[in-house]
Amino acid sequence: MLRRATLLLLVLSSAPLGAHQQKAALTTVRYNPRSDEVEIAHRFALHDAEHAAPEVTGGDAILRSDTARQWAFARYVHEAFRLTDERGAALPKDLVGVEVDGSLLWIYETLPAEAGPRIARIRHEALLALWPSQENWVNVVDAEGVRTLILRREAPEQALANAPSRPLPQ
């Protein structure tokens, strides 16, 4: 009986844990008519963000409970995510919030409404230097539909015009 219990314990302790690095982030860019702003919502797996925290926030942290480190990570993402116009000029974004929701870390930014139509290129470098397989997916939602860019270490920036538009679900 003890042998079986020991064997069972060994098998269970060697099983992969549910928490693992997703190596992907999702950002949604869309106009909100109520606020008359373009809202940017970045979604990171909390587990991934906590693994990256020592590198990007300057210290170990349990982001779930450390508000200062959440904001440090948010500032890192704010700097790593850039929107530019057709001339290459950066469009002005404001970092407005960060929150933990279950197993996700959300970071919120806004852009003045008049700048939204001028978005020509998107660059998203968050976590790309840390993990070669990291992908940053960016969905841009507008009246024509959804355009998706998949940004990777070898191509962290793309022209929005290169992304085909898919209609919004009815």
Q: Model-flagged regions — what are they?
A:
Residues 19-170:
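N-terminal soluble domains immediately following signal/targeting peptides that reside
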Residues 10-18:
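Hydrophobic h-region of N-terminal signal peptides that target proteins for export
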Residues 8-9, 35:
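Intrinsically disordered, low-complexity segments enriched in polar/charged small residues
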Residues 1-7:
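Bacterial N-terminal signal peptides that target proteins for export
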